[in-house]
Amino acid sequence: MARQCHKWYLKLRFILLTLLALTLGNCLTIVLTETQVSNSISVYGVSGASCGSVINKSTELSANLVCNEHGIIVNASDISIAMNGYSIIGPGIQSTKSGIIVPDVDNVTVYGPGRIVAFQSGIFATGSNKVGVSSIFLDDNRIGVYLTGATNSTLEYNMMRNNELGIAAHSSREVLSNENYFYDNSLAGISFINTGDSTIALNYINGSQNGIFTDPSSFSNDISFNFLRNIIDINSANGLPNDITNNAYEGNYCELSLPSGICRGVTE
């Protein structure tokens, strides 16, 4: 079991680092293109953003977006994206595209109802502070919500289904995953790599290889009162003792954890 978990962890870390490199490369391409092309699309607080829109004020969708490129790129702080019941549909999980990109800005909220489907990352936030995602259906992406270098992110009341990873946080702090629903995300419902001071609470996670995974460099996280039905429900650094990671576990209804003793037992 330990050898199998170690191989799984190495595969997960490779995937996350590869996705980070590819997506950051695309972000750089976007920035360079905007500075060189005078007729790039920018949306200033209007309804009806289109694929590839760079938004500088709060925006509402007025139709579905079917994109062969990135969906929406946020270029300012203190704004919101209202999905208004519409969908952002991408070119597939093998692409390097994201439904919504939030790079190096603060206080951005994406709220539904709405759906983001068929991207490498449904929502990708890098270097940002106070990103909120609520009431969004993220399905058939490689990663539903991908946070890297982010702080104070709040993810609530979302449904994530048929992704490889529902939520993936890399080198982030103060992530809150609260009352989200995860179904059949193949690798993990929630994955933390080098992520700490975060809370995972009141989530329902079903049908993954690992329900919740934290690596050895993820410290001081509070993981409590989640309901899990997965191959491995809670995987803390492939079995590293909790007194080393300083992660706190309370009231999690599940059957199998690494190390043992975290689960309370699933009720029928």
Where are these regions (language model features)?
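Sec-dependent, cleavable N-terminal signal peptides
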Residues: M1-Q36
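Short, polar/proline-rich extracytoplasmic segments that appear immediately after membrane translocation
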Residues: T29-S47, A248-L256
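Acidic Gly/Asp/Thr-rich repetitive segments characteristic of extracellular carbohydrate-active
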Residues: V37-S62, V66-N75, C263, E268
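Extracellular beta-strand-rich solenoid/capping regions of secreted or surface-exposed proteins
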Residues: V54, V66-I81, G90-T109, A118-N129, ...
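Structural detector of coil-to-beta-strand junctions
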Residues: G71-I73, K97-I101, G122-F124, R142-V145, ...
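Extracellular beta-strand-rich, repetitive "passenger/adhesive" scaffolds
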Residues: M83-Y86, T109-I116, S135-F137, V145, ...
